[in-house]
């Protein structure tokens, strides 16, 4: 029964595809819409996977479909095209853009909340680079920007995250002093 098989496939894929979609979409309706479109693409292409891609783990195959769908949506939707002036890129080109990762003194939920507050393009580049492991050249091609612009967006994302996380730490410190 196809309906039962589709349901089982949906249950199998839901958690990891939802996690990918949540990283890129703040709005839960947009996230669920993307998740459903990704699921549709998985169903549509499952025969191709079964005949050609059996050597690739299923979760990796579905992850690639999800990320490709999200990137295609970024390309289609012009509101994600935060353009940067060429002079602004050159200021950052000669600086070290990849800074030390955040200390492990803040919990994951606070980091996720901070990432969700980033501007859309900064968040997309941050997710692609830090979470999904893409290189700047690949991100540039995927998003239709230069690798230098990708580096600028990553730099801005990390700088903003540091500020947001520092604010959380200060608030926690103040709360602890008040409660003591």
Predicted regions and their residues:
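Short amphipathic alpha-helical boundary/capping segments
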Residues: 110-119
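Conserved RNAP core-binding helix
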Residues: 7-11, 28-48
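Internal acidic/polar
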Residues: 72, 80-108, 178
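Short, basic, alpha-helical segments at the C-terminal edge of helix-turn-helix-like DNA-binding modules
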Residues: 166-180
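Short, aromatic/basic-enriched loop-to-helix "N-cap" motif that marks the start
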Residues: 46-64
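DNA-recognition helix of helix-turn-helix
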Residues: 71, 122, 137, 141-170
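A short pre-motif secondary-structure segment
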Residues: 125-129
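A short, charge-rich alpha-helical start-of-domain segment used by transcription regulators
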Residues: 1-19
